[in-house]
Regions:
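Short, basic, alpha-helical segments at the C-terminal edge of helix-turn-helix-like DNA-binding modules
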Residues: 36-43
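Generic hydrophobic alpha-helical segments
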Residues: 46, 85-86
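Helix-turn-helix
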Residues: 1-33
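Hydrophobic/aromatic-rich alpha-helical bundle segments in the mid-to-C-terminal region
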Residues: 96-100, 113-164
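Amphipathic alpha-helical packing segments from all-alpha helical-bundle domains
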Residues: 43, 75-83, 91-118, 122-129
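Residues in soluble alpha-helical coiled-coils and helical-bundle/repeat scaffolds
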Residues: 25-29, 33, 51, 55, ...
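Short amphipathic alpha-helical interaction/hinge segments
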Residues: 46, 72, 76, 110, ...
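Hydrophobic alpha-helical connector segments
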Residues: 33, 47-79, 131
Length: 164
């Protein structure tokens, strides 16, 4: 993200450099706004949509994995955006902080769904960690057909929901 320059960005968008600085104090402020926007879209809106889908916890877990592996995720930045932000966070402490907050929020939500589905707390935490790890890993399978990724995630979810 070091390559972002206000003048170049303004020119690309067809606005003045002054217009950029009217909205953002500096490039760092733009980056923070981008990450905060992504956090809201890719976390809170996804959780809201999952809860709004209704049904029991298993139905909502299925909806969540379907959303993550489908083109519906494009509305939330998509798999490529998520992978780029994770790469960015490896080199930028501010991005890493927001990504850490996103990961914690998402995992807590999924742990809650697994508990609601009847898993014991330790099993729910382990299942959530495994499912979330698979979802994050799916970001790097962009060459795989989304339907195949969706089916694989559903298979994993079925296995994780089995009683101990």
């Amino acid at each position: 993200m070091q390559a972002i320059r206000a003048e170049r960005l303004a020119r690309t968008l067809g606005v003045s450099k002054g217009s950029f600085y009217w909205h953002f104090a500096d490039i760092s402020a733009l980056q923070t706004a981008m990450l905060t926007h992504w956090e809201a879209l890719a976390t809170e809106q996804v959780i809201g949509a999952t809860d709004s889908a209704g049904g029991n916890a298993r139905v909502r877990l299925t909806f969540l994995t379907d959303t993550a592996a489908s083109d519906r995720s494009d509305a939330y930045g998509g798999l490529a955006t998520e992978a780029a932000i994770r790469d960015w966070a490896r080199h930028d402490p501010a991005a890493a902080k927001i990504l850490g907050r996103v990961d914690a929020r998402r995992q807590d939500y999924v742990v809650g769904l697994f508990k609601e589905a009847g898993l014991a707390p330790n099993s729910a935490t382990r299942a959530a960690r495994l499912l979330y790890g698979a979802l994050v890993g799916a970001e790097h399978l962009l060459q795989s057909p989304r339907e195949q990724v969706r089916q694989d995630l559903q298979h994993l979810l079925t296995k994780l929901l089995l009683p101990d």
